[in-house]
């Protein structure tokens, strides 16, 4: 868990793209809500599960980045921004509500909606992200729980019909750069639902006085449990369509010769007119851990950690057998973990 200051000055409100709040080294598809990837290899997301969602890492909520608030007064933040012409518009909607029931117990709701109609044909993206969180941080017992929903709809245009469409400065763009999958109406829809709860109980090895705000600076042993349910799915749809390349080749006189009836996909199986392909992945994770604190967290030996874990994986994707049988086949796998570590302070 990382403690972050609450930005009440709206210092970064003008930065629509979330990855620009960390730096400028990102390769983005282009518009708000669309996929991006850091140039720095060491900053790239490394998903052990749900790798097909890595491109939207800067937008999605996860167990690791769900915010929790500890407030003296109710906090409410609402924002709506839009920019660009109507046919290329980008929209950014943000809603945050936080309130403490008691000095140690609070809840909050965060909702983000970011999207664009895009500068190219068939490039609209809608990115919706919701987190609902509850926390309690007492002297000995603490619990953090949350629900996450990520929903992403993106149109897949397949790229420009030819490099000339973006390289030739004499080419006018009255209604968007022509793309290969515009007539195919290709879309990808991502859905994610997750629930998690992480709790721990501290057993101090020295008496706790009224002046002790917490037992973080006392010798103590912490026993904890972490549970997470996380499921992701992706559905791809399209219809069989063609595109035209107005500059497919040149004739003997050097003039451009157009070519129509071009297809993005060369082969069509099962259904000759449309496609529906899906993938689903679910992980149920359980962890039990213990943490010994011989002196305090800033001591020569800060903490000695250890624990065990069990992950239950479920996978399914559309295959030819699924079409013949009329149902999806699911594959289940289990992962077991035993881990330990020692944290210390450099002198």
Residue ranges and their predicted role:
Residues 162-175, 237-272:
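Surface-exposed loop/turn segments flanking beta-strands in extracellular/periplasmic regions
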Residues 345-346:
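Conserved small/polar residues in nucleotide/adenosyl-binding loops
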Residues 121, 236, 259-306, 313-325, ...:
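Long, acidic/polar, low-complexity amphipathic helices and coiled-coil-like
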Residues 1-194, 202-217:
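Membrane-proximal, glycine/serine-rich, low-complexity loop/turn segments characteristic
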Residues 120-126, 156-162, 235-242, 316-324:
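Outer-membrane beta-barrel translocator domains and adjoining extracellular loop/strand segments
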Residues 59-60, 78-79, 114-116, 176-185, ...:
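Extracytoplasmic loops and strand-loop junctions of Gram-negative outer membrane beta-barrel proteins
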Residues 79-83, 112-114, 148-150, 202, ...:
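Outer-membrane beta-barrel pore domains and translocons
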Residues 95, 132-134, 197-199, 286-290, ...:
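Membrane-embedded beta-strands of outer-membrane beta-barrel proteins
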């Amino acid at each position: 868990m990382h403690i972050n200051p609450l930005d009440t000055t709206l210092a970064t409100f003008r930065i629509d793209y979330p990855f620009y709040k960390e730096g400028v080294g990102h390769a983005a598809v282009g518009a708000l809500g669309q996929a991006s990837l850091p140039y720095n290899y060491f900053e790239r997301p490394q998903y052990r599960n749900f790798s097909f969602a890595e491109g939207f890492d800067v937008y999605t909520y996860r167990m690791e980045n769900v915010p929790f608030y500890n407030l003296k007064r109710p906090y409410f933040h609402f924002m709506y921004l839009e920019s660009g012409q109507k046919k290329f518009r980008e929209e950014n909607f943000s809603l945050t509500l936080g309130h403490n029931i008691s000095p140690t117990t609070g809840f909050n709701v965060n909702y983000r909606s970011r999207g664009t109609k895009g500068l190219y044909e068939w490039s609209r993206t809608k990115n919706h992200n919701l987190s609902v969180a509850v926390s309690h941080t007492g002297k000995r017992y603490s619990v953090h729980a949350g629900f996450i929903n990520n929903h992403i709809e993106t149109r897949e245009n397949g790229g420009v019909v030819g490099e000339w469409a973006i390289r030739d400065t004499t080419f006018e763009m009255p209604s968007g750069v022509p793309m290969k999958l515009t007539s195919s109406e290709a879309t990808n829809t991502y859905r994610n639902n997750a629930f998690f709860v992480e709790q721990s109980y501290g057993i101090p090895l020295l008496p706790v006085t009224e002046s002790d705000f917490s037992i973080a600076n006392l010798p103590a042993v912490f026993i904890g449990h972490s549970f997470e349910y996380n499921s992701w799915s992706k559905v791809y749809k399209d219809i069989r369509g063609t595109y035209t390349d107005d500059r497919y080749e040149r004739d003997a006189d050097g003039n451009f010769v157009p070519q129509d009836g071009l297809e993005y996909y060369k082969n069509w199986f099962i259904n000759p007119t449309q496609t529906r392909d899906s993938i689903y992945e679910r992980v149920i994770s359980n962890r039990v851990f213990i943490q010994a604190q011989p002196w305090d967290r800033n001591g020569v030996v800060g903490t000695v950690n250890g624990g065990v874990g069990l992950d239950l994986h479920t996978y399914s994707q559309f295959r030819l057998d699924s079409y013949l049988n009329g149902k999806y086949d699911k594959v289940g796998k289990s992962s077991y973990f035993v881990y330990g570590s020692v944290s210390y302070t450099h002198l």
